[in-house]
């Protein structure tokens, strides 16, 4: 369920009068997503998405998110484009919530992505990193290494309810990552949540990236690590090096990783796995029955943490570099 706030047809028509989208012909709630209320609108000029931003989203972050989408779309990245109101602003108010009208993106997310899709994702991620250059607003990553210990404190006492020995294992893991987390890697705007359900395809062609509501400023290679975790593991927990090779080669066809990024990639992947483990663990333990948050199994990411812990070189992820001739 992703419609937390209902709207009436009359108030929607009044709201849309500030946009050049034609007359409303129909609208319906969209069940995808968990953070906001989303509606598919049909008007005499086409299809649009209406998003009402709920309390889980910090309203102070909305200028960053909407401005970023506008910036990326203007630079050729295929992503939803927030439409300006008559007053030039990208944000209005509907049913007491901040609200925006966003262009409709054709496509659907893949339930079973293959290597060729991973290559397209790598290309698109690198294109996003390049398109994000020059975006003037900044948003620190609240879910990077500095934010993991507060998350862990909230779940630590009950961790062994999920698996025996988990408390000690994660405490050791977190301490190691905090001590060894890299510094001075190339930074920029990252998506930070580019899971398969945030990438649309039309057939085998990538049609666009969506859901920029975790976007922030951080290491570019950390975004690559998130994608390795979210695109390149199979349901049985095994790493698919063919998918990894495709994703990394796709990324490097647009933006080449530095030597420092390549060296740091195993630790970034390990940290990325820990980040999603910790948020899943918190929701698993703290979400009351009947809540709208969909709980996801944290142990999926524990398996990934253990895999990355054994990695010695980025080549084990599928990164291939030809040596220069002597």
From Swiss-Prot:
Pathway assigned to this chain's UniProt record: Amino-acid biosynthesis; L-threonine biosynthesis; L-threonine from L-aspartate: step 4/5
Q: Which GO terms describe its biological process?
A: threonine biosynthetic process
Keywords assigned: Amino-acid biosynthesis, ATP-binding, Kinase, Nucleotide-binding, Threonine biosynthesis, Transferase
Q: Which Gene3D superfamilies match?
A: 3.90.1200.10, Phosphorylase Kinase, domain 1 (3.30.200.20)
Q: What class of enzyme is it?
A: transferase
Q: Which residues form a coiled coil?
A: none
Keyword field contains Amino-acid biosynthesis: yes
Does the keyword field hold Amino-acid biosynthesis?
yes
* Reactions catalysed according to its record: L-homoserine + ATP = O-phospho-L-homoserine + ADP + H(+)
- Which InterPro entries did the record assign? Aminoglycoside_PTrfase, Homoserine_kinase_II, Kinase-like_dom_sf, Pseudomonas-type_ThrB
Which EC number(s) are documented for this chain?
2.7.1.39
Gene Ontology MF terms: ATP binding; homoserine kinase activity
Give the UniProt family note: Belongs to the pseudomonas-type ThrB family.
The molecule here is called Homoserine kinase
Organism name: Rhizobium meliloti (strain 1021)
Provide the gene name from the record.
thrB
């Amino acid at each position: 369920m992703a419609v937390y706030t209902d709207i009436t047809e009359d108030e929607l028509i009044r709201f849309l009068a500030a946009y050049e989208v034609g007359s409303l012909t129909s609208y319906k709630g969209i069940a995808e997503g968990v953070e906001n209320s989303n509606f598919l609108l049909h008007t005499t000029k086409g299809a649009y998405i209406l998003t009402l931003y709920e309390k889980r989203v910090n309203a102070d972050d909305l200028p960053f998110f909407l401005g970023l989408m506008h910036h990326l779309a203007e630079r050729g990245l295929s992503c939803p484009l927030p439409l300006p109101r008559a007053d030039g602003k990208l944000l209005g108010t509907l049913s007491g919530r901040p609200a925006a009208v966003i262009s409709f993106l054709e496509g659907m997310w893949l339930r079973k992505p293959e290597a060729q899709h991973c290559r397209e994702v790598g290309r698109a991620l690198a294109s996003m990193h390049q398109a994000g250059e020059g975006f003037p607003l900044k948003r620190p990553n609240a879910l990077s290494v500095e934010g993991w210990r507060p998350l862990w404190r909230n779940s630590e006492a009950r961790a062994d309810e999920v698996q025996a020995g988990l408390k000690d294992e994660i405490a050791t893991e977190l301490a190691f990552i905090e001590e060894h987390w890299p510094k001075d890697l190339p930074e920029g705007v990252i998506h930070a949540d580019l899971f398969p359900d945030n990438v649309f395809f039309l057939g085998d062609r990538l049609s666009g990236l969506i859901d920029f509501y975790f976007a922030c400023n951080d290491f570019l290679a950390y975004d690559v690590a998130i994608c390795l975790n979210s695109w390149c593991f199979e349901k049985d927990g095994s790493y698919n090096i063919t998918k990894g090779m495709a994703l990394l080669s796709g990324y490097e066809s647009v933006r080449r990783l530095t030597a420092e990024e390549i060296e740091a990639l195993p630790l970034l992947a390990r940290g990325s796995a820990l980040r999603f483990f910790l948020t899943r663990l918190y929701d698993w333990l703290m979400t009351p029955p009947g809540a709208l948050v969909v709980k996801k199994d944290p142990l999926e990411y524990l398996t990934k943490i253990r895999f990355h812990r054994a990695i010695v070189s980025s080549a084990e992820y599928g990164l291939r570099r030809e040596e220069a001739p002597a």
